[in-house]
């Protein structure tokens, strides 16, 4: 068979152009018996690692080759060309070339290249030039110039596009080649692996050009021929040019480069003179141990672990990595920025002694090998959380410390999800915006999987319409396609040498940031280390709470400011509060599911919080581990350990793994260790399982390990049900699960935030509000909860408020919470500073304020709309009227005082009082909360006449009782582990109620569940032994329109369309729900 290499294959990382994944191209090329394939995406290397990972499995079985290249497009008229680096040095130059083009482009994501950029590098590449589709007078001269710049390295690409004039076109291209003295090379200029993808490629093209498939005309491919073709077909097509087929082998002959050649070198850290990195790390660790335990009181167990960890770190030469993270954390603490490591790093006593993590792994009995293992041969991965408001300071420190050409953020691939896929496909197929929106709103979830005909019909559309059917089919295929690259939340890659010779770097949309083209899975594949500089809103909240306590209660805690390490431990009152499910705002345990779990688990110590954090996750739930654990914890069933047959091992071989969780695996590490102990996985197989688990949601690869693990356990005598549950748990962790070390780090913050809520509720509420946006709840819910805990909350006021929410001493209570100007939507911090700066004397009237301040009319209107003039004895309506009478912003300064004086003498108009409901609506619209009431209380009379109960009545209702309730939807949840069950949380003036909707009810009332803001529910009370209450829905009704009756304002200001829903923190009168899938 004649060898043929396809050297111009574009994947879907040629964004909105290629219509196949890199993996699909590699797999299909091998299946068609091609000798090799070159992945060459347009001005990017973003997809090459995925192609490389797919190829690694194939190459073990054959001589099939993969080539890493790029299709270069120029802005100066230079023809497109695919270039392939011959060796590692050439690859580095290709990366730098693309980096230069990305930084030159003014728009993020673009790459502006000119011929001069390639000219001095051209000799290092194999180059195939693509002729223009139509005659260009200067092409022959440009081709000659390119050939002279890289003699012997340039080919002219020849395609057979099946467009009726292939023969004449080929003759023209052959003449160009002869004139320039370059050979022809055959290619199909591939855009997809199979012709079935042509319709999707049409959609991508239309989307790229912001048009429809029907209007795109010549922008679309003329046929479906640009797919991978077998060698015999390419030989037939190029029968008149056999030398072009043979040239593909000549083209690839000098290319030796593979991504395997990338060798990572971690940057050397500055160390004190006379020391090595190993010695410096050794000294820092033992100094930290002395601080934690006392110089002469370090427990022998800790000493042994430190020595063991330091020895392995030295063996693997990871000292610079630990010194880097230590340096970043130390810098943050010197700046007063709270931080804490999490994830697998919490397994390390070295990280604990360096102050990187806050959990003592010896007290929780965590496993260091989960963090670093010589067998895995993978770099460690330390995640550190910083205050979300100050994380950028830390990131810029990293850039300054390592320079822009040696440090960059990892990429995140923004991929199509179900709704975005349907929207783009719908637009491309010419569907109207309302039809596309209706179709998108029938989808629940992030990864799709089809749309039920009934759901399409419920959206008012015809499921038999061929365009609707086509849109759904294409959208399903499009799900998971990359749309563009963005920056990771904080993962940095740092290198000793130039990073832009390993991977291209481009500017991020955010100022002073840059990121590479590979995501976290890609860098794992090629062995690059990263440091995660992450943000966590709760750390911001805790730091602000510590500041408030020190400011207002300096006599407490010995006058010292609290820290993450100094806060009192083992406080019974904190655990008693959590056992009641009283956890609104508390880190990680504030969701409805966690609130329900707390009374059932009844945490009494720190490790219980570790379990609490981890147990409400798909892993334990899908593995059917939650209920057995709770029954054993409560003494309802004995704590037995699964065991193998006597001939295969001791009965207690899982004791060390499952002993502390009562014989039930709850953590990711336990499932992994069971695979090794019970199924006898080798370390390599266990590592494959771990990697499959990490990429399950994206790649769906974990099922390949299922039979091996289950059969391995059953063959050794374990119960099949237990084995299947263990693997289901692993699949659940692939969806979303916590390793024990991660749960332990988060449990530390659970306790601290719960302690603040328990002992300083006014401080905690103020800190939560001042740290927005963060967390699960909207300001209205935070304030309601604070008032239920005895906190006095005072409104925003021009004479008393600051930008932040503050604590204010009042005659009747020690400390009240005063709402700040930050609660007023649209009111700027600059206007706040002006207002406060001139407040040495109280403001007496609005005219007085206007005379003293340089605030524009808009600022005064916002203050009036927020009812912030209470201390002036002016209500909202009077204030709005007074603001309208103020001089225009253009009034000359010379006349301001005179105008104000004249206006002040004008008699006041007697205005009708605003209804209380109008005040509440205006409060929600301006500050997202109201101290005057809840929208539902003004509908209560009518609801009560219909027999509708309050949420409080539902909470107090007897098990099995049928009730009606109505409330504003605050949360919608359809967990993947719940087998189609949907959960709603609704709220009225008395509190919240939890609603359960079974699949058969969801099927009937899907539209109401997905779009209602105010919902009426009939159902039956379900009360557990621990007092957890749900209303199991039987009938639902959308009552959103009822809110219009509360105000004369325009309806669109009250009822936002469901497709405009955002985060629940941004709720107004009709709160936008938070939807989980």
From Swiss-Prot:
Keyword Glycoprotein appears in the UniProt entry: no
UniProt GO cellular component terms: cytoplasm
Keywords: Cytoplasm, DNA damage, DNA repair, DNA replication, DNA-directed DNA polymerase, Nucleotidyltransferase, Transferase
GO MF entries: 3'-5' exonuclease activity; DNA-directed DNA polymerase activity; nucleic acid binding
Primary subcellular site in the record, as a coarse category: cytoplasm
A Pfam family reported for this protein in Swiss-Prot or TrEMBL: HHH_6
Subcellular location as annotated: Cytoplasm
SMART domains according to UniProt: POLIIIAc
Single Gene Ontology BP annotation: DNA repair
Annotated catalysed reactions: DNA(n) + a 2'-deoxyribonucleoside 5'-triphosphate = DNA(n+1) + diphosphate
Keyword Transferase belongs to the record: yes
Its EC number(s): 2.7.7.7
Family: Belongs to the DNA polymerase type-C family. DnaE2 subfamily.
Function summary: DNA polymerase involved in damage-induced mutagenesis and translesion synthesis (TLS). It is not the major replicative DNA polymerase.
Protein name per UniProt: Error-prone DNA polymerase
Organism (species): Brucella melitensis biotype 1 (strain ATCC 23456 / CCUG 17765 / NCTC 10094 / 16M)
Species classification: Bacteria, Pseudomonadati, Pseudomonadota, Alphaproteobacteria, Hyphomicrobiales
